[in-house]
Amino acid sequence: MWRWIRQQLGFDPPHQSDTRTIYVANRFPQNGLYTPQKFIDNRIISSKYTVWNFVPKNLFEQFRRVANFYFLIIFLVQLMIDTPTSPVTSGLPLFFVITVTAIKQGYEDWLRHNSDNEVNGAPVYVVRSGGLVKTRSKNIRVGDIVRIAKDEIFPADLVLLSSDRLDGSCHVTTASLDGETNLKTHVAVPETALLQTVANLDTLVAVIECQQPEADLYRFMGRMIITQQMEEIVRPLGPESLLLRGARLKNTKEIFGVAVYTGMETKMALNYKSKSQKRSAVEKSMNTFLIIYLVILISEAVISTILKYTWQAEEKWDEPWYNQKTEHQRNSSKILRFISDFLAFLVLYNFIIPISLYVTVEMQKFLGSFFIGWDLDLYHEESDQKAQVNTSDLNEELGQVEYVFTDKTGTLTENEMQFRECSINGMKYQEINGRLVPEGPTPDSSEGNLSYLSSLSHLNNLSHLTTSSSFRTSPENETELIKEHDLFFKAVSLCHTVQISNVQTDCTGDGPWQSNLAPSQLEYYASSPDEKALVEAAARIGIVFIGNSEETMEVKTLGKLERYKLLHILEFDSDRRRMSVIVQAPSGEKLLFAKGAESSILPKCIGGEIEKTRIHVDEFALKGLRTLCIAYRKFTSKEYEEIDKRIFEARTALQQREEKLAAVFQFIEKDLILLGATAVEDRLQDKVRETIEALRMAGIKVWVLTGDKHETAVSVSLSCGHFHRTMNILELINQKSDSECAEQLRQLARRITEDHVIQHGLVVDGTSLSLALREHEKLFMEVCRNCSAVLCCRMAPLQKAKVIRLIKISPEKPITLAVGDGANDVSMIQEAHVGIGIMGKEGRQAARNSDYAIARFKFLSKLLFVHGHFYYIRIATLVQYFFYKNVCFITPQFLYQFYCLFSQQTLYDSVYLTLYNICFTSLPILIYSLLEQHVDPHVLQNKPTLYRDISKNRLLSIKTFLYWTILGFSHAFIFFFGSYLLIGKDTSLLGNGQMFGNWTFGTLVFTVMVITVTVKMALETHFWTWINHLVTWGSIIFYFVFSLFYGGILWPFLGSQNMYFVFIQLLSSGSAWFAIILMVVTCLFLDIIKKVFDRHLHPTSTEKAQLTETNAGIKCLDSMCCFPEGEAACASVGRMLERVIGRCSPTHISRSWSASDPFYTNDRSILTLSTMDSSTC
């Protein structure tokens, strides 16, 4: 009973079966024991809140943040005990932070609600009661038969029942799911394919058994049990039968499908990506600083409490007559009184912890992330793709990268394959001037091969090979070549998953056949660019793939139409690294054609020119070409019957289907006869070499992680500049055992130590890497850390992630960045501190799972060197400045207790306590953190060495933290004691002889403080816009206007009128004005002097770069500023500003960028500054 109650409440959900049973059209059995399964409805819910739970749920989430919870505790303490400040002083800022965050999150959730309502309310047609019924998407139930028309989006995950084609096929595009723009073909089972009308579907009696929902877009296992004439027919269902929600129907008039997954159980919904939980180095530093300041806060409270009781213990200090304690108070527990006073001091000093820091940082990250998407330099016009920010929490981490791990294919290369060469039966052919011609024989070629080559001199007349879709059939003199290598070309034309589309008219006939079309009217689509390149090459030679259906593939060989019955497709997977098809030739012969990596095909071969082909494959790889080996096998009728039976059993299995299929595939793909190999070229992307060189100059180590073979990977690394010709290349490949691997690693470590070479490169393959990581991680890491570039080839996806994790947890704890474009790169993208997805041709899995997405690898340089640099500088200054201004704020409060005998009297008015962080000092730092550009973006991008100035979290080091903290304490001492010396003892500064009181003294300290911290922000600003001027000087003006207004009126709703006429009285004193100016100048003068001497004696590369940007009349030749002859009086001021700020207002600045500029050179050591045009002051 108790378990049932817990299940009903949702605490103990009932055990869920591994499979679900779906009755098509919801025709449930009328007799027998049947328990219907419960399925969710088809509503999509991306929102987090409802009207009823928004307030409690949002408050709970916000108070899980330590800082918010801390200030809540402070507020409750103020309510419970007698504290020196009003609860409003803590409650109002906390309320402001909570409210701003709640409004932001509420607005975002409201947008999600609107989006959900639009999707859930979309009209759909469902087959019910023998007719089509129009309803809304949210009303679709599991088991409903849904009709979808051309160009409509599937509202749920549907199993295809039929289409307007006789073979039951349809074309869809999944661009919105995985970004693949090619058309994919889905097929219905033969028994339902003929049910093309509502009336026919009404007679269908079928049950679908399939797996429970999972997020993998490409995985689906099930079976359909169809009852016809009291006989049950079982058909397997796979990914080719499933139409995913979010995909769009193309080139097909209409289809019918049965809903198997609905609502939040669809694959699209299960792939909704939650916000990244990665934490940046800045956030970790900020939390460390918070802990340090919390220790300072507790220390100040403890010291004040102890000193208070020490003073009270002295007999000469009697209680004042106005503060006499009652008998009950005197007899109360000293421990309780100590705790009460400690809490009161804690409340008094609590503003040293900046409550508004978190909300400011959150706003800065959110608003700042838009600049990446708006950057036209990161926009790729050809593909119409702009940079995307999937998480704004890591903006500043882009400025701290020390290691870049990159995929090769589609990331460094274009992933646009061009057929270049091939090896057929031990003979090489290459494309020269667009024609396929034979190369010379291999050294061990037989005489027969030589004579054969001499007899093929007519090959110069082969049809022209182009990269367009215009294919020409071969002339008659090519017949001999094609007949001689018939099986090779047939394998290329049949062993693939390429789809075909008529580019002139939609394919909406009874089948897929395009045999009546000219080859120029055909357009191929493929998820693999390699397959498309090979099929196009075969078509240009004269064997044209025309189309396919579920059971047939059609090929034109020299104009003659041939139809092959497609028996089975053995799909590609990353473990086997190959794919195969089993076809029945027109002669009735049953053949298997296999295609895959040389390491997966050659070990399975027992015949053919294996050694010659292996040599050719290595030669292709040395040229940087991608290679595939092609083989075949013939089956006898008995062998095929056994294979067909095993495949059917594996495909219809609901449990462990993938493992069973893998075992069957291994059984089938053996005893192959090698036909040859192909080589296609994948061109490097634009400016890849320059980008890698820039990363190296910035002090970033680049690792290439690829699945390609060793020779191909090394060749591409050399061509893209990852390896230099002068670099000492070390190799850790083909290791067979742990001991052999360990010995090789020790030899490499000795070579690195002994070789007097500046740079080393390391090549390691996947097998050797597994051995190295198993027992010798430390030795392997020692070798890697001493190499400038590392290339890992033959890598599996999980190996890529493991390598990155190994670097992440190394003693140096470097910041890592992974960049890739394919689904096999997702694991390493998620493992790295920062994941970059390339929006390439292998889908959008990488882009969807990344933190940032860009269209080209070359954009990485600006993303890191400009945006990363700016974001880090901005947020590092923001964090330090917040702690600095709060130290300035609270330290006078602490010092004041020594003069009021620790009576917990507050120095500032409660309104000032409340508004200091919210209104008076918040906007200048926020605008700075959004707009600051301490160096021109062109300089940062073209001088990558400047990136080193901010590496290793340098601006948030303990040294820098202590500087800002000490600066805050020193300024606070000047505020307090400067004001104290001004007022003095029994000194009258007013014309009527009155003296300043407690509130006037506190207001004077507060006024100097507001002006000083605001001007300090102005000194840190290098890039001035009208917005900076508005918020900087406007904040000071607002403070004065507010204080005059607040102190000039008696406010009836205030309990006390402490500030009435105080500010006006303060400003009426000339001495006060003089003191304010003197203290502000004194505070900032020390800071200015330090900046001047630092820039003069120890200028950083960034500070030198700042001096290349000239103000009117200033010519910057080196780290010293020189002025033209006849300098005017403003020169000294200009010199000082140039020393302090480094850059001037953009309204006066004059930049001169040209190809001869030093920032366009590759100088790695020194910065040579060019002469720039100057004008008189």
Swiss-Prot record:
Q: Where does ATP bind?
A: 407-409, 531, 572, 595, 626, 706-708, 794, 800, 824-825
Q: Which PROSITE patterns match?
A: ATPASE_E1_E2 (PS00154)
Protein's cellular compartments: Recycling endosome membrane; Early endosome; Endoplasmic reticulum; Golgi apparatus, trans-Golgi network
Show the catalytic activity: ATP + H2O + phospholipidSide 1 = ADP + phosphate + phospholipidSide 2; a 1,2-diacyl-sn-glycero-3-phospho-L-serine(out) + ATP + H2O = a 1,2-diacyl-sn-glycero-3-phospho-L-serine(in) + ADP + phosphate + H(+); a 1,2-diacyl-sn-glycero-3-phosphoethanolamine(out) + ATP + H2O = a 1,2-diacyl-sn-glycero-3-phosphoethanolamine(in) + ADP + phosphate + H(+)
For this protein, the activity regulation entry reads: The ATPase activity is up-regulated by aminophospholipids PS and PE.
Which keywords does this chain's UniProt record carry? ATP-binding, Endoplasmic reticulum, Endosome, Golgi apparatus, Lipid transport, Magnesium, Membrane, Metal-binding, Nucleotide-binding, Phosphoprotein, Translocase, Transmembrane, Transmembrane helix, Transport
Q: Which Pfam families match?
A: Cation_ATPase, E1-E2_ATPase, Hydrolase, PhoLip_ATPase_C, PhoLip_ATPase_N
Q: Which domain of life is it from?
A: Eukaryota
**Matches recorded under PANTHER family:** PHOSPHOLIPID-TRANSPORTING ATPASE IF, PROBABLE PHOSPHOLIPID-TRANSPORTING ATPASE
What is this protein called in UniProt? Answer: Phospholipid-transporting ATPase IF
Give the source species.
Homo sapiens (Human)
